[in-house]
Regions:
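ABC transporter nucleotide-binding domains
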Residues: 2-7, 12-204, 209-210
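Alpha-helix N-cap/helix-start and coil->helix boundary motif
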Residues: 11, 94, 190, 231, ...
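Generic alpha-helical secondary structure signal
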Residues: 17, 69-72, 110-113, 215, ...
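Short loop/turn segments at beta->alpha junctions
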Residues: 92, 213, 276-279
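Short, surface-exposed beta-strand/loop "edge" segments at domain boundaries and coil↔beta transitions
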Residues: 148-156, 231-234, 259-262
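ABC transporter nucleotide-binding domain
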Residues: 169-257
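C-terminal coupling/interaction segments
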Residues: 249-295
Length: 295
């Protein structure tokens, strides 16, 4: 499997915050969700991927080239939407689009014009007078019209209404389908990523908690009702996130569950009474809680 982004043992520190041995592997052509609470290190990691910050150690490869050593050639092929857009407030939408186009030989004017119409952006309006949703649409337009191989999107739909989110996500999905591009998108909202991501990484307090295919995270997080389990258990074929007593039985929250793992309980003299699906948000909360308890 080729990767659009490879991060190995990345370290970074700013004040009291630290990224600790972060490793990520973003498959080429995927929509890769980067999930975590606010302040967990998602934005810092993305800025390191783009060469906007310098790491203390580790290795970053983007589109096959080393970052930051090959930053100019990488950034020519990457579209970026920051969490907070920083554009000249005194320019109109049209002036911003024209200015941006001058920096990218691959700029696709028909795409830009099509998105101006689809997003219903008034090209004579000052950036300062755009609503939050209009600013978000403009930033997505600028990223897509660059025709990059990789889009790095930092909380692009945070705080937007459902209609604007739908418009943006539809445009992104069409872009990936047409261009076979890769999207690396962050959010602190589980449901934002659940619907369309192929892969997901979860970050908390500067560490990667897990990195798995989205379907595996969705299908592999379960609540098990268990009877007769020993107090101390050894290695398990799944990840035990929590164990709690409830009405004479135990309720286990587990990750990386597969149906054939039921036989494990017979081997330890226990009975598996029930397997209950968890929605992704519940699984995410349990994953973070377990990670924090183990620190």
């Amino acid at each position: 499997m080729s990767h659009a982004i490879e991060i190995e043992s990345l370290r970074y520190r700013a004040g009291s915050f630290e990224l600790k041995d972060v490793s990520l592997h973003v498959p080429a052509g995927s929509i890769y969700g980067f999930l975590g609470p606010n302040g967990s290190g998602k934005t810092t990691t993305m800025r390191l991927v783009l060469g906007l910050l310098r790491p203390l150690g580790g290795r970053i490869s983007v589109l096959g080239d080393r970052m930051p050593e090959e930053a100019p050639s990488i950034l020519a092929r990457v579209g970026y939407v920051p969490e907070q857009p920083h554009l000249d407030a005194t320019l109109t939408v049209r002036e911003i689009v024209t200015f941006q186009a001058a920096f990218y030989p691959t700029w696709d004017r028909p795409v830009a014009e099509d998105l101006l119409r689809r997003f219903e952006l008034d090209d004579g309006k000052l950036f300062a007078r755009l609503s939050k949703g209009q600013k978000a649409k403009l930033m997505i337009l600028l990223a897509l019209a660059q025709r990059g191989e990789l889009l790095v999107l930092d909380e692009p739909t945070d705080g937007l209404d459902p209609v604007v989110r739908r418009d943006i996500l539809t445009a992104l999905l069409e872009y990936v389908s047409e261009r076979k591009a890769t999207i690396f998108i962050s959010s602190h909202l589980v449901h934002e990523l659940e619907r369309f991501c192929d892969w997901v990484a979860v970050m908390d307090d500067g560490r990667v908690v897990t990195e798995v295919p989205m379907e595996k995270l969705k299908q592999g997080t379960k609540r098990l009702v268990v009877s007769g389990a020993p107090t101390t258990i050894g290695a398990t074929p799944f990840v035990v996130l929590s164990r709690e007593q409830s009405n004479g039985a135990e309720r286990w929250i587990v990750g990386q569950w597969e149906p054939e793992m039921k036989s494990y309980f017979e081997g330890v003299g226990a009975s598996l009474v029930d397997v209950i699906d968890l929605d992704l948000e519940d699984g995410f909360v349990e994953l973070l809680r377990s990670f924090r308890e183990r620190r």
